[in-house]
């Protein structure tokens, strides 16, 4: 499956991974959590315990006014739904 991989301090890049839970877990280095912060039909998949584990902070999520409401820690990926 095609994904956009986003790693802390690096430029996001498109890559392919095998479909399935194990591949998603490997990409984010642990248990996965899916969030849907965009209107587009995509999921942001991140490490569910990234902040708790002290993974490096990556990118901020902002609301419609531009205010930060969360920060993703560790690697995350974005993939299309459907």
Regions found by a protein language model. Name each.
Residues 1-82:
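Domain-length accessory/inserted modules outside core catalytic folds
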């Amino acid at each position: 499956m095609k994904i956009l991989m986003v790693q802390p301090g690096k430029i996001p890049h498109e890559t392919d991974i095998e479909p399935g839970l194990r591949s998603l877990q490997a990409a984010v280095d642990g248990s996965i959590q899916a969030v849907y912060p965009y209107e587009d039909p995509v999921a942001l998949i991140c490490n569910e315990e990234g902040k708790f584990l002290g993974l490096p902070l990556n990118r901020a999520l902002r609301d419609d006014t531009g205010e930060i409401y969360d920060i993703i820690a560790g690697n995350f990926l974005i993939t299309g739904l459907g």
